[in-house]
Amino acid sequence: MGGFLTGTTDIFYWALMIFAIGQIKILQYKFKNLGKHALALMDKSKMSSDEAVNHCMKKCIILHQIIINYVTDVDDLMKPLMLMDFAICSMLISVVGIQVIVSGFGIAQVSSLQYLSSIMGQLFLFYWHANEIILESLDVSIAIWEGQVYSYPLNVQKSLQFVMLRAQKPLTLNVGPFYAMSTTTALSVLQAAYSYVALMRQAYS
């Protein structure tokens, strides 16, 4: 029962993260094709070129702000869970490592390693999706530039420059108040755990 609840909770959180990644990709597409969308809007309405571009830009900026608020809300929701998972995973790595050092490798350690590998796989899925959110949010500014921002009216260019500046600050999901989740920090966690186990091995040898 506990495993089922844990699995469904994890899937729910992964879905929240994948949704954020998808929305950022949609935003990139809209920024990259801002001129095309403005032309399509001009064909459907009586707007001038400048009005159409300005209208499409405002919709993109609103979507960007919605995504920022959404990721912030998801981060607030996940922070305690990620902190708890980090603590459990770190403790398990240390315990299993010490067991192997003190008692040798046996059946008990095999089951512990199996559980540990599932916990680590779970954590890496969280860290990988969080890393994708970081990378995709940074790519928003690239998408704006690829949309030929310099060809738009001056007021639109200035507004898009502010968006590009905001996009330089990546959207992150964090482990409690400590650090942002990414593949780099995931490897750092493993390195720290390995260092602790290596230290314990030295102490027991």
Question: What feature does the model see in each segment?
Answer:
Residues 1-205:
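Membrane-embedded alpha-helical segments and the immediately adjacent membrane-proximal loops
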